[in-house]
Amino acid sequence: VDAYREMLPTALENGLTPAMVKETVYQATDYPGYGRMLPFLNATNEVFADRNIPLPLPGKATTTMENRLEKGAEAQAEIFGEQMKEAWKNGHINRWLAANCFGDFYTRTGLDLPQREMITFCFLMAQGGCEPQLIAHAKGNMNLGNDKDFVIRVVSQCLPYIGYPRSLNAISCLQKATE
């Protein structure tokens, strides 16, 4: 959290909008999890307060309890292919994944789908131990136009923060995703 708090002002000064920052932090809810996300949300709010950025920011949700599953399955299909439209039927976790992760978060405004998918790749890469999901999200990134060279550049930028082992694992997963 300390490095994040230190770098956030520079990011805001160089084009990252407050909405993009908040959406990136919110995206972490479904990957590292709420417990790991909360300190970053608190740090974000503190930096925003120091910079006189008014809170709360305008809402970015686009789904309701009634349509979140449908919209989430549509987002999954756009990222991973049409076979994902029915994947939510394969168990309760799959249903939660479609409705919550993809329906509640991926459908929000403030970041576009390729940005969200790249951010998800970064969360999985930094977390470690998620290689099957990292391979899937490497493919998802490429399906959305974040080509292999771009993803390699993203891994390279993350290396000082996550270390060589996780960076090398991410490159290996990217290679598997392109086979």
Regions found by a protein language model. Give the residues of each.
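Acidic, glycine/proline-rich low-complexity segments that act as flexible tails and inter-domain linkers
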Residues: 2-13, 36-114, 135, 143, ...
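Short, charged low-complexity intrinsically disordered segments located at boundaries
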Residues: 20-26, 54-59, 150-154
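Short, structured motif recognition centered on aromatic/hydrophobic residues
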Residues: 4-8, 24-25, 115-125, 134, ...
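Helix N-cap / loop-to-helix initiation motif
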Residues: 16-19, 112, 145-149
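Substrate/cofactor-recognition hotspot
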Residues: 23, 27-35
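Short, glycine/charged-rich beta-strand-loop motifs at protein surfaces that mediate ligand recognition
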Residues: 109, 122-128, 141
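Short alpha-helix boundary/capping elements
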Residues: 1, 16, 32-33, 123-130, ...
